[in-house]
A protein has these predicted regions:
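Short catalytic/ligand-binding loop motif for oxyanion handling, primarily in non-cytosolic enzymes
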Residues: 1, 48-51, 131-133
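Histidine-centered active-site/metal-ligand motif
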Residues: 1-3, 45, 144-148
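Active-site His/acidic residue clusters
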Residues: 1-19, 23
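Metal-dependent active-site segment of extracytoplasmic phospho-/sulfohydrolases and closely related
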Residues: 16-57
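Sec-exported extracytoplasmic/periplasmic mature domains
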Residues: 22, 26-33, 93, 97, ...
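Active-site neighborhoods of enzymes that stabilize oxyanions during catalysis
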Residues: 70-170, 174-182
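…; additionally, a secondary subgroup of soluble metalloenzymes is captured
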Residues: 178, 182-206
Length: 206
């Protein structure tokens, strides 16, 4: 969070990690069991540069005492008092750099389902915007995550190699929920019901 994705700090960190991985694999290749080991290198999410001029504090638009609970950040879930839901929705529709949905209108791509704990209003900031609902000062960081999971900036990395995996297979994109299925298969475990795609996962394995 302290550096933007395209900063010299991030570049030097990636180069440092690359050297560490190079040393790791060089030593791993000396092992008699190297050809039996599966390796996975991954990240949990992408990062996007935060632009302070796009900062949005919902405290400037909505009365705090009209909500029973607020889970703020990227995204923000609002739990307004029943008599205030419609008013809050109308106000949020006019706030720049954010999109708001009622609970029953949240796009399926976010996979929120119908859980009763979901806030009555789901507020998602644009890429590069940070959202808060609190009186204190603005956040101090250079980048963050949690935006639309279909945005390229939010894509993670995934590399796999070893006897279990096919060679030279490249997927255009893969949901991180598939990691559970991948690891379960490597460990020969029966996965519990989940949101992963077994068809996509099968394309990676021999």
């Amino acid at each position: 969070h302290k550096a933007t994705p395209d900063s010299s700090t991030t570049l030097s960190t990636v180069e440092h990690l690359d050297r560490i991985l190079g040393d790791f694999f060089a030593k791993a290749r000396r092992l008699d069991i190297f050809d039996l080991i599966d390796f996975i290198v991954l990240s949990d999410h992408g990062m996007a540069t935060y632009y302070p001029e796009n900062y949005v504090n919902l405290n400037d638009y909505l009365p705090r005492d009209s909500f029973d609970y607020v889970f703020d950040g990227v995204p923000t879930l609002l739990y307004p008092k029943p008599t205030y839901t419609d008013s809050a929705y109308a106000i949020l529709k006019c706030v720049p750099h954010v999109t708001v949905w009622r609970k029953n209108e949240i796009p399926e791509k976010f996979v929120y389902g119908k859980n009763p704990r979901i806030g009555d209003l789901f507020v998602l900031p644009d890429i590069g915007t940070y959202l808060q609902f609190r009186p204190e000062s603005r956040p101090i960081f250079a980048a963050t995550h949690g935006y639309d999971n279909f945005a390229p900036e939010m894509e993670a990395i995934f590399y796999a190699a070893g006897p279990s995996f096919k060679q030279n297979v490249e997927l255009p994109v893969m949901a991180n929920v598939n990691l559970y299925l991948i690891i379960a298969r490597l460990l020969d475990l029966q996965p519990a019901p989940n949101d992963g795609d077994s068809v996509v996962v099968s394309t990676l394995f021999r």
